């Protein structure tokens, strides 16, 4: 049996779960179905900029209640330019290809620094025995996030860097790696991911067509063997 945990809320803190997560959506689902969703999706965004992270404790509580946790990371680009730390390509000047080609650069070291910060948070989940569906660097082929703005080779190199650092340097073994690059040309390889996913979007088309796209996502070829 699963019962959604009651997350503590600090109404005086604008960055607390009161503005990020109040479980309102969960209660709405329960009010209609009489049951809570089994899976909770959380984001580690802005840990790398010094913002306090509530997602880790929420993940632990959700796991203790019998739920499944999936994490993504809207990574604020590690640029050295003031005011340009953002995950959207159009709002940052960070060049992934250049950073990867220059391991001694501040930009490359920024990549490692941010990954290490996230690893410290993920380590807390490993110590608590929480398995995570880890979905980093998502929707890369769309180009709207900086990690996809330099093309598939740079993206694959960044994925490999992250995978190696998290797995071999930090020893994280509680991560189930989810590839969500949206395009077979961007695939990171069977040895570096466990699950393949896709994000269909509803724009101005038919809602019925959107539903069938979502329901039949397993028919889309999103990777090559």
Map each language-model feature to its residues.
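A conditional alpha-helix N-cap/helix-loop micro-motif detector
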Residues: 19-22, 52, 111-115, 213-216
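Surface-exposed substrate-engagement region within the catalytic domains
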Residues: 12-19, 26, 31, 165-225
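N-terminal module-boundary/linker segments of secreted carbohydrate-active enzymes
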Residues: 1-43, 56-60
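Substrate-binding cleft of extracellular glycoside hydrolase catalytic domains
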Residues: 45-161, 165-168, 172
């Amino acid at each position: 049996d699963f019962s959604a945990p009651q997350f503590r809320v600090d109404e005086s803190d604008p960055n607390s779960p009161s503005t990020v997560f109040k479980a309102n959506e969960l209660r709405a689902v329960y009010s209609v179905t009489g049951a809570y969703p089994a899976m909770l999706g959380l984001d580690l965004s802005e840990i790398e900029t010094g913002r306090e992270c509530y997602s880790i404790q929420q993940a632990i509580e959700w796991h203790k209640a019998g739920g499944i946790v999936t994490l993504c990371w809207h990574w604020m680009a590690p640029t050295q330019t003031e005011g340009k730390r953002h995950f959207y390509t159009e709002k940052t000047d960070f060049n992934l290809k250049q950073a990867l080609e220059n391991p001694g650069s501040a930009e490359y070291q920024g990549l490692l620094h941010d990954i290490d910060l996230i690893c410290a948070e993920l380590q807390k989940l490993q110590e608590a025995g929480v398995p995570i569906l880890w979905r980093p660097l998502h929707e890369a082929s769309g180009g709207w996030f900086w990690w996809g703005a330099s093309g598939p080779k740079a993206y694959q190199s960044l994925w490999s860097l992250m995978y190696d650092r998290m797995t071999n340097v930090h020893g994280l073994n509680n991560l189930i790696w989810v590839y969500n690059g949206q395009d077979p040309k961007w695939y990171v390889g069977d040895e570096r991911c466990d699950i393949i996913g896709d994000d269909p979007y509803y724009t101005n088309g038919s809602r019925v067509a959107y539903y069938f796209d979502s329901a039949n996502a397993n028919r889309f070829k999103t990777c090559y063997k």
